[in-house]
Amino acid sequence: MSTYTRPVMLLLSGLLLLTLAIAVLNTLVPLWLAQEHMSTWQVGVVSSSYFTGNLVGTLLTGYVIKRIGFNRSYYLASFIFAAGCAGLGLMIGFWSWLAWRFVAGVGCAMIWVVVESALMCSGTSRNRGRLLAAYMMVYYVGTFLGQLLVSKVSTELMSVLPWVTGLTLAGILPLLFTRVLNQQAENHDSTSITAMLKLRQARLGVNGCIISGIVLGSLYGLMPLYLNHKGVSNASIGFWMAVLVSAGILGQWPIGRLADKFGRLLVLRVQVFVVILGSIAMLSQAAMAPALFILGAAGFTLYPVAMAWACEKVEHHQLVAMNQALLLSYTVGSLLGPSFTAMLMQNFSDNLLFIMIASVSFIYLLMLLRNAGHTPKPVAHV
């Protein structure tokens, strides 16, 4: 049986369009807030509202899938995100956008959980790795193309919202021509997310997802603002964000191969060390292009390696629950990162963005350098 079946290909096609829309908004919303003369802490709180929506969406989606299935859950998630996009144009203000970004966050998280769970249930232990790799590549390619769009088109609010909302709705179309079946739902009923979070042998993976959420949440939410405060134009900000994301795309395959060959613990240690080096290089402002590139290559690949570390510690029937627990951990990090970092930037200096990233990475590096024991043979290849 082919790994990339018709439902999988159509699902990933729809995801590409949705990711494109999500990437454009994640870059431009902080800039639109800054243009409305909102303070740095308000920008950070709006970013955290989005990630709070991610948290709520992650918790709700399992129940939604069980009730209405993958296809209709996907449609619902897309409509919720489209509403969050269109709502930004109804009223411009801190409280209004706080609410609409929360709605968008719920829809976004539901999309991720539906797609990831559908891929997990469509695959087997022999091909889940390839499905997950395809998913990550589509996600980052969509994000990269979104950043390029920002650098090429008008970034005015009312110019962007119509076509971004249209892209979101267009992402529904591919799944109208197929049906994704939940063939393994019965195997996962008895496994709770809480049990996965408490699993001692998977703790380094869970902690890695939290740290990854802090790092990427801060970069996505506050890097455009950091560049804006440095006098960089909106078009150039889109270019630099594209550099950051393209590094993450290029790093996926080689880092995954290195993790398989030399072990995930060693690769995680090197990745976190490189994130620290990239943050220090950004603080020096000597060479932003290579600094952003190594920061993206290491930071954007941290999540899948940490996720693989945790997933190899559980049985086959626990994989979906562990995946949900890791996404929840990542979301918590994404929620805490922008809010706390924005307050530091507001009260002290914009450079606190990279000091914060380097600090949390150093803490995780200390965890990894402790005696973690030998990595056992993976239970499942994910």
Swiss-Prot record:
GO molecular function: transmembrane transporter activity
Keyword set includes Transmembrane helix: yes
Localization terms from the record: Cell inner membrane
Membrane-spanning intervals of the chain: 14-34, 45-65, 79-99, 102-122, 131-151, 157-177, 204-224, 235-255, 270-290, 291-311, 325-345, 348-368
Principal location listed in the UniProt entry: membrane
Superkingdom of this protein's organism: Bacteria
Matches recorded under InterPro entries: MFS, MFS_dom, MFS_trans_sf, MFS_YcaD, MFS_YcaD-like
One Pfam family named in its UniProt record: MFS_1
Entry's Gene Ontology cellular component terms: plasma membrane
Keywords: Cell inner membrane, Cell membrane, Membrane, Transmembrane, Transmembrane helix, Transport
Membrane topology: Multi-pass membrane protein
NCBIfam families recorded: PRK03633.1
HAMAP family for the chain: MFS_YcaD (MF_01149)
PANTHER family xref list: TRANSPORTER MFS SUPERFAMILY (PTHR23521:SF2)
Stated family: Belongs to the major facilitator superfamily. YcaD (TC 2.A.1.26) family.
Name of this chain's protein: Uncharacterized MFS-type transporter YcaD
Organism whose genome encodes this protein: Escherichia coli O139:H28 (strain E24377A / ETEC)
Name of the coding gene: ycaD
